Amino acid sequence: MTRVKRGYIARRRRKKIRFFASSFRGAHSRLTRTIAQQKIRALVSAHRDRDRQKRDFRRLWITRINAAIRERGVYYNYSKFIHDLYKRQLLLNRKILAQIAILNPNCIYMIYNEIIKKEDCKKYLEII
């Protein structure tokens, strides 16, 4: 049986996956079979961690908002704040609120005070 060297097509395929793995260490960037396995593994990790990143950032935003709110009022926390925002129909998402809490704390205190004023007025009217 004659030997087939596969030629251009196989070389092009190997070159493509070698380029992908050029930053990997050791055999993971040199051996074709190992490169193919590590490429699959890298893509799986990237896919999984895109979802994990969304969860992690949401958790970070919530922590930052909660810290900023609790500085102001001892009895007031994140869940009450978000609930009152929805009742007032203030459409600010968690990412924006966290940025405001970090970069401009006075602004988040203004939002907080607006909500508190309206809530206190409603409670006062209910008592009367």
UniProtKB/Swiss-Prot annotation:
Keywords: Chloroplast, Plastid, Ribonucleoprotein, Ribosomal protein, RNA-binding, rRNA-binding
Any one annotated GO CC term: ribosome
A Pfam cross-reference name: Ribosomal_L20
Main location: plastid
Record keyword Plastid present: yes
GO biological process, one term: ribosomal large subunit assembly
Localisation: Plastid, Chloroplast
Quaternary state and interactors: Component of the chloroplast large ribosomal subunit (LSU). Mature 70S chloroplast ribosomes of higher plants consist of a small (30S) and a large (50S) subunit. The 30S small subunit contains 1 molecule of ribosomal RNA (16S rRNA) and 24 different proteins. The 50S large subunit contains 3 rRNA molecules (23S, 5S and 4.5S rRNA) and 33 different proteins.
Record's protein name: Large ribosomal subunit protein bL20c
Native organism: Spinacia oleracea
